[in-house]
Amino acid sequence: MFTESDYEKLHQIMAESPEKEELLTRLLHSHHMDISTISHEIRNPLTLIYSTLQMIEASNPEVLNIRHWSDLHSDIEYMKQLLEELSAYNNGQRLSPSSTDFDIFLKKISLSFASSIIETDIEFISRIEPELPVMPADSIKLREVLLNLLGNARDAVLIQQSSCSNHLDSACNCESNRFLNPGKALTYSPQIHFHAWKEHSNLIISVSDNGCGIAPEHLSSIFEPFVTYKSSGTGLGLPLSRRIIEAHGGTLTVHSEPNLPDCQLKTTFTLTIPIP
């Protein structure tokens, strides 16, 4: 699978001559078709396997007590998720833009995410500045990007909260695994900030959190396909997010300082989308 740097090099070569552009355009189209075909061919037998498992369970309920039987379901669900995300990544640059009022659009996303964490201790701070643009955008794909970033922030603060709860006699910093102020009562308060504003001719959207942060050695690779440092996940969420933002002519960047105190925001993802 091509990485983002591969695509950049291909586009540089395509700019050299019309002949190279035509040849590489056909190559990229064939590459997209191959991935779509492979995903389709795998998905069909996978669906059949899942149906067979359900039939076995219905006629032989005792199999539910077999060790690792439930792992079969988990593995199948993971493969289905992988195929769905692979297909989404393959089509990440294909947009269906429509007129989007970003004030309304972002407030809906903010409310949707806030309702999903209502039973947690997470403090969610949303700041949507006035005079955001109304402009063409693929709102469905942008929604996926923003909810993915917010979901990652939620995971990061919950990991940090869990790490701190395991050390009730000290305040902690999970990335460095160092513990500060021994003997002091733990006061970790998980926070996620969602901020959108207009700056010159750009729409800027940021998602920040005071979770466990991202190790410096991982920052350069988190946007590469299939790279993940989570116990679960396919490693396609961030690459797909960047691909969608770049298809809008924008950028998606990250800044993280995992060794900051827990009261400070450690990781920020920033989307910059040009306003036509």
Residue spans for each PLM region:
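Conserved signal-transmission helix
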Residues: 1-30
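Conserved catalytic submotifs in the C-terminal HATPase_c
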Residues: 118, 123-133
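Conserved glycine-rich
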Residues: 250, 254-257
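Detector for a conserved hydrophobic position within an alpha-helical segment of the HATPase_c
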Residues: 245-246
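Conserved DHp (HisKA) dimerization/phosphotransfer helix of two-component histidine kinases, i.e.
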Residues: 2, 66-116
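Short alpha-helical Gxxx[C/S/T] motif in the catalytic ATP-binding
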Residues: 237, 241
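Short conserved segment of the HATPase_c
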Residues: 214-225
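Short beta-strand/loop element within the Bergerat-fold HATPase_c
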Residues: 164-201
